[in-house]
Amino acid sequence: MEKIRPKYYITTAIAYTSGKPHIGNTYEIVLADSIARFKRQQGYDVFFQTGTDEHGQKIELKAEEAGITPKEFVDNVSTEIKRIWDLMNTSYDKFIRTTDADHEAQVQKIFKKLYDQGDIYKGYYEGLYCTPCESFFTESQLVDGKCPDCGRPVTPAKEEAYFFKMSKYAPRLIDYINTHPEFIQPVSRKNEMMNNFLLPGLQDLCVSRTSFTWGIPVSFDPKHVTYVWLDALTNYITGIGYDCDGNSSEQFNKLWPADLHLIGKDIIRFHTIYWPIFLMALDLPLPKQVFGHPWLLQGDGKMSKSKGNVIYADDLVDLFGVDAVRYFVLHEMPFENDGVITWELLVERMNSDLANTLGNLVNRTISMSNKYFGGVVTKTGAAEEVDDDLKAVVTATKAKVAAKMEELRVADAMTEIFGLFKRCNKYIDETMPWALAKDEAKKDRLEEVLYNLVESITIGACLLESFMPETTEKILAQLNAEKRSYEELDQFGLYVSGNKVTDQPQILFQRLDIKEVMEKVEVIQVKQKAAMAAASQEEEKEEEAVIDLEPKEEITFEDFGKMQFQVGEIISCEPVKKSKKLLCFQVKVGSQVRQIVSGIKAYYKPEDTIGMKVMVLTNLKPAKLAGMMSEGMLLCAEDAEGNVCLMTPEKAMPAGAEIC
């Protein structure tokens, strides 16, 4: 009789289809995948769901900017997201889209059910709305007058809307959180939700909009579309066959409640306040745990296109490989605090942890086995006391990894596994196989040492599978080792004595030269900037800032007519020595070349300006700046933050063309 396996239902937040996900977004799916794979290895019947969130005002606006329908827009982005999830070797069981017909039908039924039972009522909304976050806020919730979640401006919104009676369920939710300490993790997230939202008192939630149309219509009042979060959150139940009429699927009855909702810390409020209250209203059990993971930051800031610091998964994979990227994002992210990714840190980890600690260990062990015994690995029983310590470390690692994974401390679990590999490297130093090989009388001892190394690496590789699955396969193939069951991973000595390792060991991870990597990174960044510039008309149109200047003294047309403005072409540019601000330009204006000195060194690299068409005041009296003659002025614009950009003609114009 087949053993009944315990179920484990894990979800990620569904990715918002406003654009291509960067590595910070991608971290979540890799983290969830490592947990799902580990649970499968432990014997759980795992169902792992992810997908895309495809409705909302932001998407409607982006589609309009792109000149296509919202459905065409989300089809393109959802396909790209799925491609990246697959590129990262994630083992999801279902990829749901909120534009799926069965999901939309259930959302309409859920809305109607909540309305019929009095949890939703019709009213009038007037307040503040953040379009990127699809969220409403009161004045008191804003931070410096802006959205508390993303920091962008909010806009006044006034429209007829349906509301959900959040306050009706708030006491019940507070009691639930207090009696289920494991529900919101880490604990700091729980404290934030209780102190900032629940205990001060919940306001009723606006759950429909009439100011845009890209959403799921309210079935009995189709001028309203369902609030995107009511739509998106229900994917966790609609994706596994929930039906609010009482005809839910066998799969739903088996899987719900979810064991883990894995989400970013920025959307913890929606998942630990709105979502559980919706479930209470539907008379459904709450998920067992919601884990709000930290952000993966680029350098010292959150990744965003507007900051120009975006790192994409496919660029990382092209440079380092899938498993190296998986290793980095899983190992470098703390349990609670934000992690940091930089190209330099990636190279450092690749060289120290992957190429040296792991890759060199495997390569040395296989090479010594081939050199001394033709690749044959034999257990001789010629043991010494130092072996006991190695075996103790190796056989204890499984339990240590399991304990860390139970707490979702994935980075710590990987540290335990790499601790095993480090212990193997230390064992080589302790036993000195090269010295044993010089003494024929110590042949049996040498064989035992190499057997212990192969066995230890095999166990470590099997434990590594949830995090770096391709690397596990490569190691086991080179060792000619069978994949072990989870139950066997604390047993030492199962490698078949007499097996032969490969006689052609492959380097698992090449050492990288930081200079070469950064040259490739520069190419990537140049391409990104070019792509962003080309797509600038399709990017989200942020509310443009305006700057009011103190008016200067009026001038007459005659005064203005004295100034001559022409188009110039920059043909060379050099920094001015001993100056922190100045660049010296050679600018072609008509048939002449003028030298112009400008204080924009902080905003442009000299090489980036060559070939630019710029606007030049050409009849300004020449003057010396830092000892260099300047024969004109380059026209620039400056924003409120002091950022400066050169003014350039909208269309291609010849050098010397008059600006009038």
Predicted regions: what they are:
Residues T472-D559:
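Intrinsic disorder at enzyme termini
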Residues E2-T50, D102-Q106, P156-K371, A413-I417:
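Structured secondary-structure scaffolds
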Residues E2-V77, I96-F111, D116, C133, ...:
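N-terminal catalytic cores of NTP/NDP-binding nucleotidyl/phosphoryl-transfer enzymes
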Residues E538-C660:
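Phosphate-backbone binding interfaces of nucleic-acid-interacting proteins
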Residues Q117-A170, I174:
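Cys/His-rich short segments
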Residues K122, L345-A383, V393-V501, L617:
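Helix-rich, typically C-terminal accessory recognition domains appended to large enzymatic cores
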Residues Q289-G292, L476-Q478, C584:
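Beta-strand segments within the central parallel beta-sheet cores of soluble alpha/beta enzyme folds
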Residues S78-D93:
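A glycine-rich helix N-cap at a beta->alpha junction
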